[in-house]
Amino acid sequence: MNRVVITGYGVTSPIGNEPETFLESLKTGKNGIGPISKFDVSETGVTLAAEVKDFSMEKYFVKKDGKRMDKFSLFGIYAALEAMAMSGLDTSQLDVDRFGVMVGSGIGGLETIQNQVIRMHDKGPERVAPLFIPMAIGNMVAGNIALRVGAKGICTSTVTACASATHSIGEAFRNIKHGYSDVIIAGGAEAPITEIGISGFASLTALTKATDPEKASIPFDKERSGFVMGEGAGVFILESLDHALERGATILGEVVGYGANCDAYHMTSPTPDGSGAAKAMVLAMEEAGISPEKIGYINAHGTSTQANDSAESKAIELALGDAAKTAYVSSTKSMTGHLLGAAGGIEGIATLNALQHQFIPPTINVENQDEAITVNVVLNESKEHKFDYALSNSLGFGGHNAVICLKRWED
């Protein structure tokens, strides 16, 4: 079996598109949530989202790329190329048949779908764009990344709603662990902040209608009222340890465990007792070969909905037992909003940053922690902490649970 290490990462997020900016935002508790600027929100009752700011198209794209790819693909490619640059990978020195891409998306090209349905309605079916399908389908983020970097190995795009990125990272970990690939770009990308996206989740009563960005995404708070939609991408460069050492790569961390299962309970609600998510955490720790006492931090799914935060708190206590009293928990969605299928990508990166720099990112804007949530939540300010192992949880509609276990790298 191969050990699997992280040698690079890239982010496109509401709190920064460069590694240094993203890290500083995590440490200082920057709020990436604000008024929706993309369209008129007056009829939806939802006014806030976590939009990507200062996205530099010019860095990696030409003008026509914006007309040939949906924004979720652009976000994913940007993050992948940033990760490649950090890792120092030279594709001319790789066996490209063992170089893969596993980048998921929960919804895919939602903006493209919306625009083309309107176009067909207004102008007729013959006016639908020829590239509508390849712009809209969710797998194209992985396909477009592979095209851009020349990766000819495994290329998949997992669709498991809000667990998509974490499933992609976990499956990439297993693929390398069992010897099928040397290097895989793994994570998720999403661009759901559209009229139809906001309206759909609002109709489901999943989104908060709070109008104050400081009181909107408040995981574990007694007054939480729904999640704030976000957008962006987060990807890792995963690599076998032997391959990384052979090329002299800088190793940032190690993936040591992965757990995945299904609640088989409800279309959109988690198992109230948290048993499904708990089992996924246990599976990740078992593969890592560690006891719950070793876990120093859990980056919770923590959506700021009543159902999720209550169930996940119970899940952590079920999975860790007495160790849940000492493991620190936070939800970085309080800063980034909920990136749906990309959430596990940027949250995995946040977890890696926490391990590298030995701190716990805060859950910001929490004024009154729900007394029924008794896990050890780090509130409002980051906390210095020495630890070696962490979990990153992602729980999706459909009952999908995915958890990765990361280990701090010691030279």
Task: Label every PLM stretch briefly.
Residues V128-I133, G153-T160, D221-S225, A327-H338, ...:
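Short pre-catalytic strand/loop immediately N-terminal to key active-site residues, enriched for Gly-Thr
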Residues I6, F22, K27-A161, A189-I198, ...:
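Conserved beta-ketoacyl condensing-enzyme motif
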Residues V41-E51, G108-T112, A191-S217, G259-K279, ...:
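Active-site-adjacent elements of ketosynthase-type condensing enzymes
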Residues D122-A129, H167-G170, R174, E190-E246, ...:
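Glycine-/small-residue-rich "gating" segment that lines the acyl/pantetheine channel
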Residues G76-L89, G138-A142, A146-E190, V228-A249, ...:
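Active-site-proximal alpha-helical scaffold in enzymes
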Residues R3-T7, K30, G34, D212-A288, ...:
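Condensing-enzyme catalytic core mediating Claisen C-C bond formation in acyl metabolism
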Residues M1-I6, T91-D95, A288-K294, K325, ...:
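Flexible, low-complexity linker/loop segments at domain and module junctions
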Residues E20-K27, E111-P125, N175-H178, I198-T211, ...:
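A glycine- and small-aliphatic-rich helix-loop capping segment at beta-alpha/alpha-beta transitions
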